[in-house]
Regions:
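Alpha-helical phosphate/pyrophosphate-handling elements in metalloenzyme active cores
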Residues: 57-91
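Alpha-helical scaffolds flanking conserved acidic
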Residues: 38, 85-101, 140-151
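Post-HExxH zinc-binding segment in Zn-dependent metallohydrolases
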Residues: 121-137
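Divalent metal-dependent phosphate-bond-processing catalytic cores, especially two-metal-ion Mg2+/Mn2+ enzymes
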Residues: 139-207
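Short alpha-helical hairpin
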Residues: 34-56
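Post-HEXXH active-site segment of zinc metalloproteases
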Residues: 109-123
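Active-site-flanking alpha-helical
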Residues: 102, 106-107, 156
């Protein structure tokens, strides 16, 4: 085996052996392995103490809890806009309320920093919490939930202000807003969600 092959073999083995023992992580509510399976209200409410990455970057003061509630309200508006039956509306709102609940313990992490091991741990924690409430992921609503999540960020950008930094950064906020709106419409097309309807909904929400 050449030195290059040995290096590749070593990296492959290291990648396969990567694992985050999240169950033994201590939290103020107890060991995460227990808390994620039996989440108490203190644990869940911690999302209001977790700053959004966008806020950490210097724009606004939003936390994960505010984002979560915004997405849940958007799910209500979206359901009314589409005249969804009560069962579908309630399902979508429930999923919106818990879509980022794992961030109560891991925080808001940029996708770039989510390694395979980190993603696996996040998914396991999320599954634990959903199972505690007998909530199952609904693939039929996955695309709409993702769309609403993106709209929630668009609303967050619209509410932000460059406090403590050069006012010229307002131009940057406008650019970020325009880019996020483009991404929403692009995702709608990709997910085969009526783009015209999405545009109409955004206008109705003044976004």
């Amino acid at each position: 085996m050449s030195s290059m092959e040995r290096k590749k073999f070593h990296l492959s083995n290291r990648h396969m052996s990567e694992h985050i023992d999240y169950e033994n992580i201590f939290t103020p509510q107890g060991m995460l392995g227990h808390v994620s399976k039996h989440p108490n209200l203190d644990f869940l409410m911690n999302i209001f103490n977790i700053p959004r990455v966008y806020s950490v970057s210097g724009f606004g003061t939003w936390n994960v809890g505010q984002h979560t509630v915004a997405v849940a309200f958007l799910a209500l508006y979206w359901s009314a806009f589409n005249a969804y039956p009560q069962e579908k509306r309630d399902r979508l709102v429930t999923l919106a309320l818990v879509h980022d609940v794992h961030e109560a313990v891991i925080g808001d992490i940029l996708p770039f920093f989510k390694t395979t091991a980190v993603r696996e741990a996040i998914e396991a924690i999320q599954r634990d919490i959903l199972s505690a409430f007998a909530i199952e992921e609904d693939q039929t609503l996955h695309d709409e939930l993702k769309l609403l999540d993106m709209m929630g960020f668009l609303y967050e950008i619209s509410q932000s202000s460059p406090k403590g930094i050069d006012p010229s950064k307002r131009k940057l906020i406008k650019q970020m807003y325009a880019r996020q709106k483009e991404q929403i419409l692009g995702y709608a097309e990709e997910a085969e969600i009526d783009e015209e309807k999405v545009n109409e909904f955004l206008k109705s929400m003044k976004l």
